[in-house]
Amino acid sequence: MSTSDASIIKPIQWCAIEPPNLPAAIADWLMELGSMTRRFELHCQQVHVEPQRECFISRDELGEEAEHLPISERYWLREIVLCGDNQPWLLGRTVIPEGTLSGPDRALVDLGTLPLGRYLFGGNNLTRDYIQVGRQDELWARRSLLRLSGKPLLLTEVFLPASPLYSI
């Protein structure tokens, strides 16, 4: 696992609205309201997480992500590769204001190889403000502002070429 400054997620071109030419089967994946981990599990024998970067960062390091999150002195950053049957399917980047990491949710800094979805969707205190669709060259991406017990976190997901999203 790295703590370097380079994000595993390259710049994404975010769409203001859902693209009109978005195929229905791809839209179904991108607009998934449940756990992407659970959805991936329907397409493989085993899902596992490879953590790439886990550390606290400053607001200056957020770039345009700062527009989506409240002001905080520090943010927990977690970048991972999610694999299905040992094939990289998704790059994930989670940015969590330090204030969200209170009480039992402090456990978010210790997820290690546990998929984020297992933690977030394990209870009934999760809501989603929005899903925004984007492209990174030929790859589809999405980001969601989620609230855990009313406290925000920003999740960005890039679907890699081997992802079942593309095998429709």
From Swiss-Prot:
<dbReference type="GO" id="GO:0042866">
    <property type="term" value="P:pyruvate biosynthetic process"/>
</dbReference>
<feature type="binding site">
    <location>
        <position position="78"/>
    </location>
    <ligand>
        <name>substrate</name>
    </ligand>
</feature>
<dbReference type="GO" id="GO:0005829">
    <property type="term" value="C:cytosol"/>
</dbReference>
<keyword id="KW-0456">Lyase</keyword>
<comment type="subunit">
    <text>Monomer.</text>
</comment>
<keyword id="KW-0963">Cytoplasm</keyword>
<keyword id="KW-0831">Ubiquinone biosynthesis</keyword>
<comment type="pathway">
    <text>Cofactor biosynthesis; ubiquinone biosynthesis.</text>
</comment>
<dbReference type="InterPro" id="IPR007440">
    <property type="entry name" value="Chorismate--pyruvate_lyase"/>
</dbReference>
<comment type="similarity">
    <text>Belongs to the UbiC family.</text>
</comment>
<dbReference type="GO" id="GO:0008813">
    <property type="term" value="F:chorismate lyase activity"/>
</dbReference>
<feature type="binding site">
    <location>
        <position position="157"/>
    </location>
    <ligand>
        <name>substrate</name>
    </ligand>
</feature>
<dbReference type="InterPro" id="IPR028978">
    <property type="entry name" value="Chorismate_lyase_/UTRA_dom_sf"/>
</dbReference>
<dbReference type="Pfam" id="PF04345">
    <property type="entry name" value="Chor_lyase"/>
</dbReference>
<keyword id="KW-0670">Pyruvate</keyword>
<feature type="binding site">
    <location>
        <position position="36"/>
    </location>
    <ligand>
        <name>substrate</name>
    </ligand>
</feature>
<feature type="binding site">
    <location>
        <position position="116"/>
    </location>
    <ligand>
        <name>substrate</name>
    </ligand>
</feature>
<protein>
    <recommendedName>
        <fullName>Chorismate pyruvate-lyase</fullName>
        <ecNumber>4.1.3.40</ecNumber>
    </recommendedName>
</protein>
<dbReference type="GO" id="GO:0006744">
    <property type="term" value="P:ubiquinone biosynthetic process"/>
</dbReference>
<comment type="function">
    <text>Removes the pyruvyl group from chorismate, with concomitant aromatization of the ring, to provide 4-hydroxybenzoate (4HB) for the ubiquinone pathway.</text>
</comment>
